[in-house]
C-alpha cells in the first residue's frame, strides 16, 4: 500500500497544504547512499556553501522524481469574517471545516507535517500563525487519539536537506513592461524556484498550474511551494536516511 504525506503551511489568508504519494521503499533503497558529510559544499566560494555536491545533486534529482503530488490546496480562512486583522472565532471554524472536508484523505496519510512557527529569534513573530498552527496540531491529536502523530516540522529542514545556499546574492527581476531591477534573493524565492524545478522535471503541469493560479489570484505562491518541499525533505529524512 502506498504511503501518503501531507504538509501544511499555516496562515489565515493562505492555509495551504500538499499531499504527496511516496515512492515505493525499494526506490529509496536502490539510490546511491551518500554519507551526510559528503553531500554539501562546506568550503569554497561563498555562493556555493550549503549547496549539494555533484554526486548528491544526482541523488536529489532522482529522489524528488520519485514522489507524486496527488492534491494541492490553498484556502482563505477569513471568508465570512468581519475583521481580518484579528483571529475571529469564524477563522478557527473555517479551518475546522476545511480539515473536516478532507478527512478521508487524512485517514490515508502516514505522516502529517505542520510547519513549525518560530517563537524566538530576532525576526517578527507571527502570533496569529502560531495560534492557528497549534489549533491545527490539536485537531489531528484529538481526531486520531494517538493512532497518528502530527509533526511540527522546522522550516530549516527543507532548505538544508534540499541544498539551499547559505548565502544569497541578488536576482534580476523582469517586470511585465520589460524593465528590470536587481532584487535580493532569499529562502522564499529559492523555495519557489526549487518547487517549480521539481514539478517541471516531473512533468506535473497540473500542480504547476494550481500554484500559478493562486499566484495570479494574489494568494502566496510560496506557501504551496513550501508544502511540497516539506514533503520532499521528510522523504529524505525518513526513507532515504533510514538504515538500508
Describe every region a protein language model picked out.
Residues 1-244:
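Phosphate- and other anionic-substrate recognition elements at nucleic-acid/protein interfaces
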